[in-house]
């Protein structure tokens, strides 16, 4: 199945994405990851005010098939979490790049944060190899 990977996002090889708007980062998971997980039944995210660091899990997503840790593409402080997705995680797949976002962070260092992320084309090539 072919998925959309918006060009204005950056991706991790673990399937999280980030949209950076100045010092505010919106984080979610890709359509490919959602398809691989299947029906999502539970989502655990950090509280507003908590710090998240690149390379350290900030929560997890649970489906009928698996439980996966979530990793932030950027470091920062949580300024908002998508309570609608926590309450109804099965809706994440309806609009993963819009209403299905997970966290918003105030980024520590916006200029250097995207160094270890993939462009949409790089990510598309990677997931086509996994499918």
Curated annotation (Swiss-Prot):
GO BP term, example: glycine decarboxylation via glycine cleavage system
Keyword Flavoprotein found: no
Stretches assigned to the Lipoyl-binding domain: 24-106
Top-level taxon in the UniProt lineage: Bacteria
Modified residues (N6-lipoyllysine): 65
Assembly and binders: The glycine cleavage system is composed of four proteins: P, T, L and H.
UniProt family annotation: Belongs to the GcvH family.
Function: The glycine cleavage system catalyzes the degradation of glycine. The H protein shuttles the methylamine group of glycine from the P protein to the T protein.
Protein's name in the database: Glycine cleavage system H protein
UniProt gene name: gcvH
């Amino acid at each position: 199945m072919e998925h959309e990977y918006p060009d204005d996002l950056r991706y991790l090889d673990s399937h999280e994405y980030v949209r950076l708007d100045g010092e505010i980062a919106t984080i979610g998971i890709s359509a490919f990851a959602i398809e691989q997980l299947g029906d999502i039944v539970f989502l655990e995210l950090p509280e507003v005010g908590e710090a998240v660091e690149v390379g350290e899990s900030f929560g997890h997503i649970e489906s009928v098939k698996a439980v996966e840790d979530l990793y932030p593409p950027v470091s920062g402080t949580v300024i908002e979490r998508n309570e609608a997705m926590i309450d109804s995680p099965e809706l994440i797949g309806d609009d993963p790049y819009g209403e299905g976002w997970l966290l918003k962070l105030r980024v520590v260092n916006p200029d250097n944060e995207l160094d270890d992320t993939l462009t949409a084309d790089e990510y598309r090539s990677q997931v086509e190899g996994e499918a």
